[in-house]
Amino acid sequence: MVYSYTEKKRIRKDFGKRPQVLDVPYLLSIQLDSFQKFIEQDPEGQYGLEAAFRSVFPIQSYSGNSELQYVSYRLGEPVFDVQECQIRGVTYSAPLRVKLRLVIYEREAPEGTVKDIKEQEVYMGEIPLMTDNGTFVINGTERVIVSQLHRSPGVFFDSDKGKTHSSGKVLYNARIIPYRGSWLDFEFDPKDNLFVRIDRRRKLPATIILRALQYTTEQILDLFFEKVIFEIRDNKLQMELVPERLRGETASFDIEANGKVYVEKGRRITARHIRQLEKDDIKHIEVPVEYIAGKVASKDYVDESTGELICAANMELSLDLLAKLSQSGHKRIETLFTNDLDHGPYISETVRIDPTNDRLSALVEIYRMMRPGEPPTREAAESLFENLFFSEDRYDLSAVGRMKFNRSLLRDEIEGSGILSKDDIIDVMKKLIDIRNGKGEVDDIDHLGNRRIRSVGEMAENQFRVGLVRVERAVKERLSLGDLDTLMPQDMINAKPISAAVKEFFGSSQLSQFMDQNNPLSEITHKRRISALGPGGLTRERAGFEVRDVHPTHYGRVCPIETPEGPNIGLINSLSVYAQTNEYGFLETPYRKVTDGVVTDEIHYLSAIEEGNYVIAQANSNLDDEGHFVEDLVTCRSKGESSLFSRDQVDYMDVSTQQVVSVGASLIPFLEHDDANRALMGANMQRQAVPTLRADKPLVGTGMERAVAVDSGVTAVAKRGGTVQYVDASRIVIKVNEDEMYPGEAGIDIYNLTKYTRSNQNTCINQMPCVSLGEPVERGDVLADGPSTDLGELALGQNMRVAFMPWNGYNFEDSILVSERVVQEDRFTTIHIQELACVSRDTKLGPEEITADIPNVGEAALSKLDESGIVYIGAEVTGGDILVGKVTPKGETQLTPEEKLLRAIFGEKASDVKDSSLRVPNGVSGTVIDVQVFTRDGVEKDKRALEIEEMQLKQAKKDLSEELQILEAGLFSRIHAVLVSGGVEAEKLDKLPRDRWLELGLTDEEKQNQLEQLAEQYDELKHEFEKKLEAKRRKITQGDDLAPGVLKIVKVYLAVKRRIQPGDKMAGRHGNKGVISKINPIEDMPYDENGTPVDIVLNPLGVPSRMNIGQILETHLGMAAKGIGDKINAMLKQQQEVAKLREFIQRAYDLGADVRQKVDLNTFSDEEVLRLAENLRKGMPIATPVFDGAKEAEIKELLKLGDLPTSGQITLFDGRTGEQFERSVTVGYMYMLKLNHLVDDKMHARSTGSYSLVTQQPLGGKAQFGGQRFGEMEVWALEAYGAAYTLQEMLTVKSDDVNGRTKMYKNIVDGNHQMEPGMPESFNVLLKEIRSLGINIELEDE
């Protein structure tokens, strides 16, 4: 296996057996590809902005004399880059400019004669852009648009499963769902009549819609029924015989022909009878006259002579009618073929209850149902019906919908129109009737073939289209009204509705969510999330059990494990590792093709529908070297069921064992040994891990850590290979390899690192270089670690030495006992950054002012502020300290003009302003690490703002000039090379100043050309530098665009360092969570024979009942990994020769049966081996992939290699007494996470504080500085104990007795502890409520 330079530094030993056929795809592609499709020019006009424009334009005027046509669009450049947008609190977006053409036609001339054409580029608002990591910056905060799983457009056949009607009869229904437009439902009622509903309105007989489509009763019956033909010959009734139709019926008369009786009266007609009739080719049989009674005529019969209607279509025949028909000369009578078994008379019955009899009455009926109360006119009724399903503006099935529609009706072509046709509606009704007749199955709506993914691009396109449609109306008005000769396209278009629609979607849609930025994993998971909620989706309350459940089609597409606990369970899912969406938006997953029993490396992506036709083997099926299955019978999946198949029946095989699970679940080692519920908690809790001060890679991982760290975008990754030319804490410079350079560039890549920034969850984002000077790097190498990454691998927690044993009740109920050493070594210390903002507004009484001159505040409180009234950077502040001094004018007193004059002269200010400074919230203390001041355009900047500006300018200049120097150096080294090769002596050249080099001339023409080219590049470089510097200066010095009424905003950033402490929540990766109960001194912790104390003591009772055994295997394997690290450490300390070191490390890597990873340390130089050993000192990292991990035997071998007991248990001694514990204890290394549920954020106490206005009771909750609720049940408890005085105190002075509590406060201050309870305010509220009912209730003094 080839390792890149960074990977060589620390290779993870892989226990995976199955070869990696397909690399893990880029994990954010679902977001990036979708948005790319939205903004990129699409000549076909299928997707994105192009599709939206084409669907709305051209817009014609009502008269048809003019139209506005769309030509093309372009997106401009964003004004600010992503970081600037975040700092300034603006949206990262680009202006959209559209080229439109206004065409005016001649009025009198023949149609299509053009009078005038005007073309112009029009601004159409801003389109938010996606950052490289798949997020959007909206108003300065990073947001993610979650993909939605919604019901695919098309037609669905379903049943109520017998739940609607009391008889338990199953009622079938069909529903045509368009991408946009009205829903059309057909449904049976318990009497087997067929009804139609439009948009879930009142139901109408289904034949009304057929009549509205211009069908007559005869045509309707013709469409849905076969005919039975009777002929009257010689006063006898004969019936044309179709033997197949008789099957299963009981003969009501002898069936005979040519003197032979085939079936006797009363006998059941069987397949044998039918075969005989067919064999003898019987075409007609004689039937008794009574047999026709009750049959239904299929068409109108008219008396030719008189023109009188004897029998109408769909009328039941009787013997009288038969006689009349016979008399009027009708000898051939057509009736409908129905029976109770599989040809029900549903449509015939429906026609009977249909009140309409022609097209107009049907349209009127539909109009009345859609618009009750409006008087119908013929035109209104016709246009309403036309617009419902047959107008492209109002109705669209979309390509997906048409494909699903045609597939469902078993048509051959999958393309077609987006609107419905007559045939579409009739075919749906026919299929529904077939299902009712017992032919065909209903659809499964939870099948992933019937649900599709709607991603960012598509949702943004829909919103954009909504905006365009709003504009369309206005444009139509203007085209009809105005004087067109003077108007230009930009006078027609108002960009407001478009930007409003887009802004609303990105800012406040249910699917546009505040990004979860706790750690890199939570970012990636959030972007790969799939929600069934949101506009056009389900709601929590309505979603039943079936929708939430795991479906067989989820395999390899949606993770069966990772979903929230609580009301959203199963509605919010996570995409599986290898899943992707196809062109229609259905999820598909990769499989290896199996040809002639040989598994090939050919990969096919199959959607849920396609998968149903194949037999698919599991990824853990054993193969020989040629790729044949070893076993005769292979475990496979087919049509949603799992069973054994012979090896030559197999069509496909899974790509990887982790194909089933999501990224979060694929990071849990030994997932196969955990109960699913606990694995769910484990996957969810990894997302809540707070990045620790020093990241520590997991000793036991799954091999997915690198993919997650790199794809999440928190690390700095090399764009091109080269060598590290410069590196410090905030920037890395790479000199690019010759072969990767673009022609004519300096070949220098500069990576600026992010330093101590705040994430959405107030955790700290900080990048640190992990390469050193002169190191070679390749494309894709990790150059700098971000939060929670260690040498390019995801590192959410810390490796802890744990023991499973009870310890004095301190680990009762999942509590965790932690050693003091963990605190001392800052293992779980985290940095949290809080942003506090102070806004100075323009009020009615005058502007608020940011100043250090605050009334009634002592010197001490102002000691940390500068002269502008803003806190210094580096100040240590605690709760209640002033960060930004601000005063607000207060205007209770109306001043006389004389007073005003005096005020103006003497500037007596303090009396009319109140202190509204920004203070540190209670319970928070930290260090100020940054201050930003934003000043409105046109408002004078204060001293601090100017200082900050100057600093930023200086920094920008320094950055740019350093960049220029680096690029210049690169360029001059190339100039040097050209000059030397052109014959100039190197020594002389070095004596010349660099800028004079370009003045030299060379005789060789080719070299001279090269030199001139380089000189041009040099000039361009300087010019570019000036331009960049000017742009930066302009951005820094220009005023800020603040909200109306805001003059200034000061943002202060506090860094809070939080050590681990009792009450903090910790967890492993297997759903084993607990709260720290005690931090124990090191000397009291249990220790082993070598005197090494354990770090954490966990309760063994937390394992068996929860069935997450993965944690125990992880503990053992972690111990082995650490043991090997210890041996390497000892060898390094003894300075043993490299050969021995190489041999031992090689043995460790080779251990384990037929593992896929072959590490050959002989290809490593001695230096590389030493560096590797240095990085393995703390333990050899191990990968045990999901469902393909280390076996028990392999763990034992590894323990043996590390000189550790293979039982995984050791003898421990009690730290307090030094006595040995009576049994050996499982001790090992487990990866523990500190979760973002910190006790500091939850601890809260109140003495006095704010009260609710109406009830005068204290508020509740930490945010309001509220009290503890003493509720109804607590009152009962005091009553039960008879604690009368305590109860009285609780209900009066401690709560809402206003006078009593004020007096009480005074008494306590005076040292007098007497209590005088009065009337609780809530009693007055009760009185008022009773009075509001009109009952006068008064309190009388006795």
From Swiss-Prot:
**The UniProt record lists the keyword Transferase:** yes
Q: Under the cellular component aspect of Gene Ontology, which terms does the record hold?
A: DNA-directed RNA polymerase complex
Q: Which reaction does it catalyse?
A: RNA(n) + a ribonucleoside 5'-triphosphate = RNA(n+1) + diphosphate
The record's annotation in InterPro entries points to: DNA-dir_RNA_pol_bsu_ext_1_sf (IPR042107), DNA-dir_RNA_pol_bsu_external_1 (IPR019462), DNA-dir_RNA_pol_su2 (IPR015712), DNA-dir_RNAP_su2_dom (IPR007120), DNA-dir_RNAP_su2_hyb_sf (IPR037033), RNA_pol_bsu_bac (IPR010243), RNA_pol_bsu_CS (IPR007121), RNA_pol_bsu_protrusion (IPR007644)
Assembly, per entry: The RNAP catalytic core consists of 2 alpha, 1 beta, 1 beta' and 1 omega subunit. When a sigma factor is associated with the core the holoenzyme is formed, which can initiate transcription.
Please give the HAMAP family that the UniProt record associates with this protein.
RNApol_bact_RpoB
Q: Its biological function?
A: DNA-dependent RNA polymerase catalyzes the transcription of DNA into RNA using the four ribonucleoside triphosphates as substrates.
Q: Please state which protein family the record places this protein in.
A: Belongs to the RNA polymerase beta chain family.
Record protein name field:
DNA-directed RNA polymerase subunit beta
Source organism per entry reads: Citrobacter koseri (strain ATCC BAA-895 / CDC 4225-83 / SGSC4696)
Q: Which gene encodes it?
A: rpoB
